[in-house]
């Protein structure tokens, strides 16, 4: 499974 | 973090502070759409639930806390503290037309079918259209105070700067998040008309007013 994108943005 | 992302965050923060100060100093929320502010409070609440599950950085956490707290402060000022000055008669956009479709879309198009991920996606979609009640109010009254125009410009340019940030990240980090990019494009497009008026009128010292 693809990782969901890292939520490092606001 | 690249320069576009940083400037985007700063302009977002500036927008929030400009609005808070405008209302607090003038003791009035005339010309401000309470509905848009309510939508932004929902946006921040549903997006930053990861405050409880993930720690990314001190910067990240503090900005999120400031965004959430200030959005609630703004809503409180409009609907409680300075309620008498709130121009509800002109704030007539039907927010269910924004909330329902974005909620449905977030169930259909998301990265992962989990509660946190769906709420995050919902917040991205809702943010892209949350300014519509405010823009509707400006078009209905045909004018906006200059300080409100500065607020709208700072808020609009923030997502535009994020678009450049995403181009940068795709180029140098091979990172991209299609949901955020498409929503960010929609969000930016909604401001284009306003950007034009801002540059041609407000920056030349005139008040923003629309032809009757």
Curated annotation (Swiss-Prot), chain B:
Does the UniProt entry include the keyword Membrane?
yes
Site Important for recycling of cargo proteins with the sequence motif K-D-E-L from the Golgi to the endoplasmic reticulum — annotated at 193
| Membrane side Cytoplasmic: residue ranges | 25-32, 80-92, 136-149, 200-212
List the record's Gene Ontology CC terms alphabetically. Answer: cis-Golgi network; COPI-coated vesicle membrane; endoplasmic reticulum; endoplasmic reticulum membrane; endoplasmic reticulum-Golgi intermediate compartment membrane; Golgi membrane
What molecular function terms (GO) are annotated for this protein? ER retention sequence binding; KDEL sequence binding
InterPro entries for the chain: ER_ret_rcpt
What are the subcellular locations of this protein?
Golgi apparatus membrane; Cytoplasmic vesicle, COPI-coated vesicle membrane; Endoplasmic reticulum membrane; Endoplasmic reticulum-Golgi intermediate compartment membrane
Pfam families for this protein: ER_lumen_recept (PF00810)
Region Interaction with the K-D-E-L motif on target proteins: start and end of each range?
A: 47-48, 159-169
Q: Which domain of life is it from?
A: Eukaryota
**Intervals, Lumenal compartment:** 1-4, 53-58, 111-116, 169-178
Q: Function of this protein? A: Receptor for the C-terminal sequence motif K-D-E-L that is present on endoplasmic reticulum resident proteins and that mediates their recycling from the Golgi back to the endoplasmic reticulum.
Please give the name of this protein. Answer: ER lumen protein-retaining receptor 1-B
Q: Which organism is it from?
A: Xenopus laevis
Gene it is expressed from: kdelr1-b
